[in-house]
């Protein structure tokens, strides 16, 4: 369980994110100093192009392969995957033996609230940030009304401008932690009770 940094700033989970952030700093500065553009926590591009400007919140994404995550409107699903070393080869073999890809066993239909949260997470974690006008057009409210954004701004992890909400350089380093703060209780319960 991820605890809010506002309620338990010295929780074990938060300290792990702090350690991850410290490990992240040196290579991040090295890449930036050498002209790379950071587009997400783990993605740096050396020759930015117009492809780097594409929004991260609305594309239809159909993933292929073992563990691929797909986003099709309000449907979110993934093919089976494992992180256990001794199970990886078997999972890939099972995937390669699949003949019917029209059936998914690991997915669900997102509620409007979950779609809103997904839009926030996907855009906030991307270097262009969240477009406020697009958010308001989709969800009928201003993202400035979300208390968590004010709390992240107080920590200087986001920059809230007239038209966008973007992670700061420090916030980008904590993006694994920040993204989890936006996960709904319903999704968190599904994650915690999922059995493989």
Which role fits each region the language model picked out?
Residues 1-139, 195:
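C-terminal scaffold of the Radical SAM
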Residues 115, 165-172:
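Basic, amphipathic "hinge/linker" alpha-helix immediately C-terminal to the N-terminal HTH DNA-binding motif
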Residues 132-133, 144-145, 160:
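Extended hydrophobic-aromatic, low-complexity segments
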Residues 139-154:
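Short amphipathic alpha-helical interaction segments
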Residues 153-163:
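A short, conserved structural fragment
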Residues 172-196:
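Short, amphipathic alpha-helical interaction segments positioned at domain boundaries
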